[in-house]
Structures are given as C-alpha cells and as structure tokens.
Amino acid sequence: KIKDNKVKYVEGINGPANEGRLCVKGRFGFDYIHHPHRLTKPLIRKEGAPKGLNVDPANPLTHFREASWEEALDRAAGGMRDLKAAHGGQAVAGFGSAKCTNEEAYLFQKLIRQGFGHNNVDHCTRLCHASSVAALMENVGSGAVTATFNQIENADVAIVIGANPTENHPVAATYFKQFTKRGGKLIIMDPRGTAMKRHATHMLQFRPGADVSMLNAIMHVIVEEGLYDQAYIEKFTENWEAEKAHLAAFAPEKMEAICGIPAETLRAVARDFAGAKAGMIFWGMGVSQHIHGTDNSRCLIALALMTGNVGKPGAGLHPLRGQNNVQGASDAGLIPMFLPDYQTVTSDDIRGKFSSVWGSGDWSAEKGLTVTEILDAVHHGDIKGMYILGENPAMSDPDVTHAREALASLEHLVVQDIFLTETANYADLILPAAAFYEKSGTVTNTNRQVQMGRPAVTPPGEAREDWAITVELAGRLGLGWRYASPADVFAEMKLTMKSLDNITWERLEAENAVTYPSLSPSDPGQAIVFADGFPRAEGRARFAPASVISPDETPDADYPMVVTTGRQLEHWHTGSMTRRATVLDAIEPEANCSLHPDTLKDLGVAPGGMVRLETRRGAIIMLARADRAVARDMVFVPFAYVEAAANVLTNPALDPYGKIPEFKFAAVRVTAA
C-alpha cells in the first residue's frame, strides 16, 4: 500500500515461491527506505578528513561535502582512470551486490572486465554459498538448485543440514512444516538446536566441524547394507567405485566419537533416507562456511546421487540461498572465475564470445581474486582503488579489523549505496543509490525463478538507480555503452546466457516470474532438472570422495570454546537496512549472543548480563542470552551489530576450492564483562 510516495504496509502476492506468504522482514521491514539516514546527494570527502568508523550517518557533512552528480561521476571515474594509467588495470577492483538486480550485477562485472582488463570482481556469494557452488559445478555441472524448495511437497524424506529456516528462510520453513504435517520424515542436522527440531523425526546435533565424518558414516551404512540405487548410479554417475572404497573406513561405530552422534542414530537416518521413494537435501551456511565447506557439499551431492535422488519429483539438492538475488547475481557473472551462466573465464572461446557481444578487446584469462583475496591485495599494495556497490565489507568480512585497515589504505574508494554504511565511512566518494522498492529490474531467487521487479515509490532526493550510475561511469571510462533501460541490458544478457532462453522482458512483465530453464515460450519453467542426465562430460554426475579435515583453528587452553556466527529472524546481514526498520529494530535493538544456561552459570553471568568474547583477532563485549539450543562449549553471535561486530572475532582461513572464510568456527575465550 502506497500513500504520498511512502510504503504504508506490504502484503504477499500469490507468487510461485511463496503463494502469498511473507517473512517477518518482508512484512515489517520496509520502512528503512524512508529513514532520514538515506543518502540523497553525491558526497565527496573533505580534504584531510580522516577515514575510519567516525562518521555519524545522520550528519555526514562533518567529513564529506555535497556535490553535483556531474562532479561526483567525473571524480569517481577520473580516479579509476588515473590509477589504471599509473599502475595498470589491476590496480582497480570491484565488489558488487546480491541486493541489486540481475541487470545491475551484469553491468558491474562487465565494467570491471571490459574497463580494467581483469576478473577481480566478486560479491557476497563468496561469504555464503561459494563452496556449495564449487562442489555443484564440479560434480553436477551447474551451480543452481536441482529442484525448487516447493518440491518437498512430493518428498517422503527431507534432510535440512546447517540451516535454520525458521529464522533465515521463513517462507521455505512453512513448506517444511506442511511436509511434516502430512507425514513426511524431516531429518535436522545442526550443531545448534533449531526451531525446526520440533517437527523433526531425527535431530542430529553433531559436533561443530564434524559434517564430513557424520555424512560419510551415513553413506557407509547405505553401501554396507546395499541400500544404494545401482541402476541410477550406472546410468548417470561416474567414480562410484572410488567413492565406495573411500567410505569403507567410515563405519558409524568409528565416527560416533568424532561427530558426537550415536552409531544407531546414524544407521537409522541412513535407512530412512535411502528407503525414501523421493528424498530432498537442503543446506545452509552451516555447511558452506567452513574451510571444508566444499567437502561438506560433496558429501551431500554424493548422498543424493547414490540414492538416485536427483531429477525426479520430490528429490534433489537445494542450497538455500541467503539473499534475494545472490542466485541471480552469480548467474549474471558477478564472480571472479566465471562469466554469466558460469562460463569459465579461462576459455579463449568463451571470452571471445563475450568480447564480440560487448564490442571490446580481450581481457585476462586468469581467474580473478575473491572478496578476501582482493582486500589482502590491497594490504600488499597491488590494488589501490575500488568501486563498491551495495556491499559492506567493513562489517561482513572475516577478521574485519584487517578489512577496515585495507579500506582505509585505498587511494581511491567509490561507494555506491543507499546509506552511509560502515564501508562508506572509508570512501572518497559516495554515490546515492535507489533501493529495491524504487527501481526496475529482474531478480532470481533460490528456486531459479526469474522475477520482475517494478518501482513502487520514487527514490529520495537525487538518488539514482544503480544500473544508471554504472552506465554513467562506464561512459566516463570510455566504454561507450548505450542502454536506455534495464530491458536493454536484459536483451544483451540473453545473447550469452542460455539459461534465459524463452524468457523475455515482455514475458516477465506479463507473467511476473518464469523459472529457468524454460523449454518453450509458454513453459513456466522446470522445477526439476537433470532427469535425463547432467551438463557434464557424457551426461554423468561425479562422486568426489571427501576426507575429514579439522577446522583451521581448534579450541585450546587459552581459547577453550567455539564461536559461530549467523543471522537472526529480525536482522538482515550487517543491519544497514533492518536496524533502520522501525518494527524490526524495536524487537531486537541490542547486540547479543547466545550461550547454554550451564555455561553462563559457570561464568557467573546471569541471562541478560554482559560477556567478553575474545579470539586471536580481537574482542567484543555484548549482552548474553541463555539458550539450551547452543552446545555448552559454543557461543552463537549474530553479525548485524556494529557496536559489537561479530567479524572482529572470525577466522579468515579459506576453503581451498570455494575460497569461502570459516565464519562458522573459531576458538574463543568467554569471560564475564
């Protein structure tokens, strides 16, 4: 409901993914767009104004001055041009955003590649499901889900591992609950107890970091008892014999001491899943945000393949994506190793195809640097300028003190956002952008559903849509782009992205959403893929045996507990939007962490008291809550609060394949504050 160019309330529409349902953020988290902190004019840092977390977003003119768009764009592009001329294109890198549209993500990666000649462009997928995508690309041949979450309606058994859908995917959680009400078996696996366990047949609260030992033990039982689907394996997979031989060493009786789950429970779960007519596997960042995140995902893929649970109704692999457009931004090429549609940057033929469409010369065949690697390169002096659109690494990156030091050292930082975020505190120029409610463009959700977004209100002040700002910068960088609207960008995307076959702008305007792949102009899209093979050599998916790898940093006498980080129901990622949403911030206004009641008692801290959390990277102080869902040797910390930033604590160690940091495990010392 819109009145006087303001959103008054929000109702769910009958879309293919939600059928009228909304999560708490969608229903109550909309008024941030009208917050007085909104950026409305371009800002340029005043001469000598120090960089750091020292700017009041309500009064940015202490450190910045207002500028015209002409001056700001000239300076933004000019600074990038100067760095390229002095040091080469590698001196400038970019972070895009999963909060932007597909068209904006596409233009952003194109600007970095075409304008600076390299692939050092990334976004927050590196911090959430990069390891999942690495495993899926390696073994299935596609980085998207094989079945929509709605397909749980056709399943007998479903596994949800490393995810807390009640808080982080509330709409999907309603389908999971419906599934159990009609008799479906729900298996929850998580080091934290979650609200979904009330609906579960089995709750496996395993030891943090022990995913591979637990999953391999389950698969060992399936092999040992002959419960695997031999016909499916022979027809659609490869490397089965190696997988089978590898699993021989993972008997549940050996693994129970490692993962903390009794052997009989592991055997029961194996029998339930293997015995299902159709089984689905859902996972979240509890699986992916480890140095062994790719191995965790390889295990889940292997479990689905050996039981024949891909490519049929009620079966499949579904990494629950964490942002409204992290799927779409990844599809659009906003990642350093792939061009749009996951086409590798290392192929001369593929780059040649894009060069032809773009009307430009070739660029580097090297895979680019990822989010954390880019900031490391800033520290080393190799990258001297950045263009950051809708991303907040000063809050979201691991070992965030290191990230902030990198941002402060940049010679030229352009930040494009809707608020003066923590990252914008380090900017030389700030460009005011339109929020999602204020722009046109498509987004692609976790279900592979491409959806049309339309503006409900106009942007405040002089704020502009992100795609239009990027096009203006490209012009000043000499790229000669000609786009009159997001529809023009979408038309270009279709020239190189087969996933968009049979999906047109006009069709999306008429139908609102189409799932890819769509096999004809009238096909609403395929909810299930790979029924007749996989987009790999000879149409076969691959088994990739995974070994047990310890977390990078394990508890010891100095740091005897484990800290894990994540989201809350009320707050979204770094909090820049939801902490400015009236209802959501009123419900959850204060930085907090969760510990087991016995742990608090041992610390001499009452629930609601303050604790100090310290790792090898830094310390924070925050309010402590009692939560029996948290293991006695664990503390859970949400990462939305700048006053007690969880990522001061986190470990920047990376998964070697997905290059994702280990947000879910670090050794910590907890004391009364």
Q: Could you say what each language-model-derived stretch is?
A:
Residues 327-335, 486-583:
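Long, low-complexity segments enriched in small/aliphatic residues
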Residues 45-66, 227-263, 340-353, 358-362, ...:
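N-terminal leader/propeptide and maturation segments of large enzyme subunits in energy/redox metabolism
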Residues 165-174, 392-402, 441-444:
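Glycine/threonine-rich flexible loop motifs
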Residues 274-376, 477, 521-523, 532-536, ...:
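A glycine-rich, hydrophobic/aromatic-adjacent loop/helix-cap motif
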Residues 93-101, 258-261, 284-291, 323, ...:
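Conserved short loop/turn motifs at secondary-structure junctions
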Residues 1-227, 235, 239-242, 254, ...:
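N-terminal export/assembly segments and adjacent metallocofactor-ligating motifs
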Residues 192-195, 418-455:
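Flexible glycine/proline-rich, aromatic-decorated loop/lid segments
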Residues 460-514, 519, 574, 579-594, ...:
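Long, contiguous, secondary-structure-rich segments that constitute the structural scaffold
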